[in-house]
Amino acid sequence: VSKSHYFIINESKEHSWKVWKDCGNNPIYPQGGTWPYDRAGWCPGTRVDEEVFELTYLVNPGQTITFDYEIEKMSDNTEENGIYRMSHQLFSFGPPNFKRNLELVDIINPSSKDSYSRINPTLGKARVIVKNVGSENIRRIKFLYGLISGKMSTFHWRGYLKFLEKSIISLPLNDWHGLKDDKRFFIEAVTINGRKDEDYTDNKIISEVQIPQVLPESFVIKLKTNNYGRSRQNSYNISDYNGNSFYSGSDFLDSSNYDILIQLENGLYRFVFYDSNEDGIDRLWWKEKDSVGISGELGFYDVEQNPLKVFPPDFGQEIRMDFIIGPIP
């Protein structure tokens, strides 16, 4: 259960946050067992959440201060042996070396990193994590981005980033022509608040593009549903990157087989299969599998019933797959 955690400084609650993590889209899957269940600040195999906050405005050099840590009271004792494990670090530093200094931390899309595998491969909107590491608040950023040997795109972002604040910025769709020959994608912050960044060493970042699977113009989604009412938890949608939906479905029947014919023109598409209970379509896993219903099945097949892509049933919250109809750009 989500609980509030508090830092108390000089007997005053100065910072609070919720400790709870959605594990249904854990990139490390399938694992077996209870891995999709939400947890207090962690998911099996992934990094523990961090909470960072600034103390500068609360203290003066040479001052003695007191710290205390408080957690919202737990009223549900069904997990009476549960405990919190935590560590705390205090960092002190001098004034920033630069006024205008934006760090490009990481590219989320497109990326070949395992940590972003749930939302890649994709040729959709690029997303980048940025951090203000200069003393000047950032209100405007000019981005240049695209394939290194391809056509560049430009985007002017407006917002507000204070010192040490992070943000995830989505960039408009870019031109992918030449992807077949060059899979290197870059994002560069050209100007900050209309002027050059004072530290250019962290203004450009490169990722490797994984090309989505190419599918035929006509293919079949084969779905075998669970029983015990779990089929009602499932739905699917096929759309393009402009948000236009071409196929969707829900309200499936238990213990049923569906062959859904898909016919699409050349283009870039996204398939998402949802499970509202975030436990996939596998049998409920870790104990007495044969007594808890049947396992579902999901896959793409060509019109001659040959498999194109078979998805694991133990997927947690959703299956997401971007794909190409027609030639690779």
Question: Model-found features: residue ranges?
Answer:
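Solvent-exposed serine/threonine-rich low-complexity stretches and specific carbohydrate-binding patches
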Residues: 16-28, 152-165, 171-173, 247-254, ...
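Surface-exposed, short loops/turns at beta-strand junctions within beta-sandwich domains
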Residues: 58-61, 175-182, 264-265
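Loop and turn regions of beta-sandwich accessory domains that flank beta-strands and are enriched
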Residues: 27-52, 57-59, 73, 208-328
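Extracellular/luminal regions of secreted and cell-surface proteins that mediate adhesion/ECM remodeling
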Residues: 70-218
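Short coil/turn segments at secondary-structure boundaries
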Residues: 20-21, 142-143, 285
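Extracellular/secretory-pathway and virion-surface proteins
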Residues: 1-100, 108-110, 117-122, 133-136, ...
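Solvent-exposed strand-loop boundary residues in beta-sheet-rich modules
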Residues: 11-13, 147-151, 193-195, 242-244, ...
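Beta-strand signatures of extracellular beta-sandwich domains
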Residues: 6-8, 142-146, 235-239, 299
